[in-house]
């Protein structure tokens, strides 16, 4: 690992963030689902401030990113940190960058008095599952994620 830093994304990073999102979606075989644009990301991240992004750099070159936001746990009674995306370039995996990004987010969660940090992982993604388990993250075996999108969301809103 050369000179390594994790920094907050700036408005100038929007094209990079979108590129990382697309690379992650391609890896997850979900590129066809990405509809985000630079304009949408700019509005969401820097105008509405709905989420935050950190960029991992080695020798000044971007090697990965994490996008996260706060949710709330009624059970814990405190906000949590929800990791939406974590991505490290394939050529830079296994060098500690993913671990450094997770550690950085854990530090943010502790500094902000979050009760927990959570994320989802595709069930076929064994390398990521093994990585998360090696960081002492526990899978939520008894929970299933549900989602409403598109027409289903619009129809539900009408009822």
Regions of interest found by a model, annotated:
Residues 18-44:
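Conserved GNAT-fold acetyl-CoA-binding loop/helix
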Residues 110-120:
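Conserved GNAT acetyl-CoA-binding A-motif
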Residues 99, 123-142:
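Conserved active-site alpha-helix within GNAT-family acetyltransferase domains
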Residues 119-128, 147-150:
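Conserved beta-strand-loop-alpha-helix junction that forms the acyl-donor binding cleft
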Residues 43-55:
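A short helix-loop-beta-strand connector motif used in the catalytic cores of GNAT acetyltransferases and
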Residues 5-17:
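A short beta-loop-alpha structural element at the N-terminal edge
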């Amino acid at each position: 690992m050369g000179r390594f830093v994790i920094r907050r994304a700036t408005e100038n990073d929007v094209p990079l963030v979108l590129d990382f999102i697309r690379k992650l979606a391609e890896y997850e075989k979900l590129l066809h689902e990405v509809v985000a644009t630079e304009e949408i990301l700019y509005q969401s991240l820097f105008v509405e401030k709905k989420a935050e992004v950190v960029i991992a750099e080695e020798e000044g070159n971007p090697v990965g990113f994490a996008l996260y936001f706060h949710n709330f746990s009624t059970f814990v009674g405190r906000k949590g940190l929800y990791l939406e995306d974590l991505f490290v370039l394939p050529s830079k995996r296994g060098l500690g960058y993913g671990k450094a990004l997770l550690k950085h987010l854990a530090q943010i969660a502790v500094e902000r008095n979050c009760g927990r940090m959570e994320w989802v992982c595709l069930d076929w993604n064994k390398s990521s599952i093994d990585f998360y388990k090696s960081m002492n993250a526990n899978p939520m075996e008894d929970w299933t994620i549900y989602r409403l999108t598109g027409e289903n969301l619009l129809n539900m809103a009408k009822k």
